[in-house]
């Protein structure tokens, strides 16, 4: 949710964590605001901040390195900590950005399981090696239902599928209704 926070503030916060716990901190960067408009306003952020996500990632990467991209501005602490960055996503946009920047990519397939294969293939195909990563590195978050009893696990899975089908149907019908009836 990088659009909710200025890169300098994130660099200082994660620089502090890295200073306290060296080698134990990773930073996942997502583009989605993850909030409603009122909360976004309370954070003093603009809905268009998500459009600056790629440049904010590059700026943050620079603030955590030894060379700040902003003349006369340094993240203290943060400068030189080189906290590992991961691009988080559930669409092809995140895969393309992670590939272009040579960063690891974590795909939220529990949000968009149908896009997992295409996003990972795109990331691997377009990956450009960088100073931080020589080869593509993918993490996939997946939804799973587990139980010691197979029948209870299967029941949980069927409930999950039914819930998602009903929710998807309702959202689709609402969108069709809005598209057809609202000018």
Labelled PLM ranges:
Residues 1-2, 30-34, 90, 110, ...:
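Active-site beta-loop-alpha junctions enriched in small/polar residues
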Residues 25-29, 83-88, 105-108, 136-142:
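Hydrophobic faces of well-ordered beta-strands that scaffold small-molecule active sites
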Residues 93-95, 99-111, 119-120:
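A conserved active-site cap/scaffold subdomain adjacent to cofactor or substrate pockets
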Residues 14, 18-24, 97-100, 124-135:
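Acidic (Asp/Glu)-rich catalytic clusters
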Residues 68-71, 83-91:
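Core active-site phosphate/anionic-ligand binding loop and the adjoining beta-turn-alpha structural block
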Residues 3-65, 105, 113:
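Flexible, glycine-rich active-site loops centered on histidine and acidic residues
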